[in-house]
């Protein structure tokens, strides 16, 4: 028996809605990364995009446990000498909570050519409303 390798057009894509209210950021991001990659499907193939679309609502209500709000944060470098920038999660969640989820999910995806394709299938919204009702997304409890 040969190993099954999925083709990109063979795997049906579904839409899921996840409510981030009261969910820890890391656990939420890990579950989202699994769905975006398609690892929850039996047809999973590592080099093919077999994942589903994910809509995250109520991004402003995601939580961080312990002292991570002040101690941890988002680091980036401007490519200039001494250009290491640090934004604490408290400030990031106040101004751009959707970006905090996107950064966490991006870090949990493989660092290859498929990562940008996976990230395009992630839609994050600050409040409870989203414009994707036409896709008939399923509510996914995490």
From Swiss-Prot:
- Tell me a GO cellular component: cytosolic large ribosomal subunit
Source taxon at top rank: Bacteria
Question: Keyword annotations for this protein?
Answer: Ribonucleoprotein, Ribosomal protein
Keyword presence, Nucleotide-binding? no
Q: Where does the record locate the signal sequence feature?
A: none
| BP GO terms, sorted | negative regulation of translation; translation
Sample GO molecular function, one term: structural constituent of ribosome
Classification via Pfam families: Ribosomal_L13
What job does the chain carry out?
Answer: This protein is one of the early assembly proteins of the 50S ribosomal subunit, although it is not seen to bind rRNA by itself. It is important during the early stages of 50S assembly.
State how it assembles. Answer: Part of the 50S ribosomal subunit.
**Family to which the UniProt record says this protein belongs:** Belongs to the universal ribosomal protein uL13 family.
Q: What is this protein called?
A: Large ribosomal subunit protein uL13
Look up and give the organism this protein is from: Caldicellulosiruptor saccharolyticus (strain ATCC 43494 / DSM 8903 / Tp8T 6331)
Source taxonomy: Bacteria, Bacillati, Bacillota, Bacillota incertae sedis, Caldicellulosiruptorales
